[in-house]
């Protein structure tokens, strides 16, 4: 698995180092971190973790020993000094480069999947990458015409109709087309990724009590229910 560092000024390097310090994840996969080699070195040292940070080059994905943390650093030059916890174009550009490299490795078949540490949305926009999040950026890099964000936890598999928008803007963004698309993508994902032959997809309401016949909003009757019925008919 390729694990992108996320924003070097953020929590990503620490989360990655702590996660890979244990044996549980290494029993499940062969991890390789795609990010800044000096930042990972400094992070491991500051946390007093008993791991050797090693650099791997190019498309090399040989599994490291249990006490090694393998890092593929695609940066042309070290990041140098930067403020922690602050959005800057410098670290924003680096985090985007890490994602692009991970996509390249996945498309070449060098890694089987990508795990992403947090990016800073403000920082990537400061760097000229005008995407609201990982989902939209990954769709663009892979030329994927239809995409959606699904979160998985235990028995729950939740597909979003909208992503990365302010709550106040949400009602105006809900359309029958978008809802039908989310239902269709959820159905396909449950079949193809989770092996569920006959998935059951539930559609959540927007308003309290599903609008209570218009007392608390009409999006359910006007948009959500027609989209649900259209999807059922397909």
Model-derived segments and spans:
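Structural signal for conserved beta-strand scaffold positions within catalytic alpha/beta enzyme cores
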Residues: 55, 73, 149-152, 160
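Contiguous, glycine/small-aliphatic-enriched amphipathic segments in soluble metabolic enzymes
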Residues: 1-134, 177-234
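Short, flexible loop segments at boundaries between secondary-structure elements
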Residues: 140-156
């Amino acid at each position: 698995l390729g694990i992108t560092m996320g924003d070097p000024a953020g929590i990503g390097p620490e989360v990655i180092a702590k996660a890979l310090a244990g044996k549980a994840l290494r029993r499940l996969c062969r991890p390789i971190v795609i990010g800044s080699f000096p930042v990972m070195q400094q992070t491991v040292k500051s946390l007093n973790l008993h791991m050797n940070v090693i650099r791997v080059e190019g498309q090399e994905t040989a599994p490291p020993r249990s006490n090694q943390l393998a890092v593929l650093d695609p940066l042309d030059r070290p990041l140098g000094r930067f403020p922690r916890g602050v959005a800057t174009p410098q670290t924003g550009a680096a985090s985007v480069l890490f994602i692009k490299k991970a996509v390249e490795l996945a498309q070449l078949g060098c890694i089987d999947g990508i795990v992403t540490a947090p990016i800073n949305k403000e920082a990537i926009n400061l760097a000229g990458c005008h995407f609201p999040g990982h989902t939209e950026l990954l769709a663009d890099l892979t030329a994927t015409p239809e995409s959606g964000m699904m979160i998985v936890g235990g028995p729950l598999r939740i597909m979003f109709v909208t992503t990365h928008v302010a709550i106040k803007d949400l009602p105006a963004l809900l359309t029958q087309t978008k809802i039908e698309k989310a239902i269709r993508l959820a159905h396909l994902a449950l079949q193809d990724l989770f092996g569920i032959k006959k998935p059951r997809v539930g559609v959540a309401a927007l308003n309290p009590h599903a609008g209570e016949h218009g007392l608390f909003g009409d999006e359910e009757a006007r948009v959500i229910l027609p989209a649900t019925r259209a999807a059922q008919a397909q």
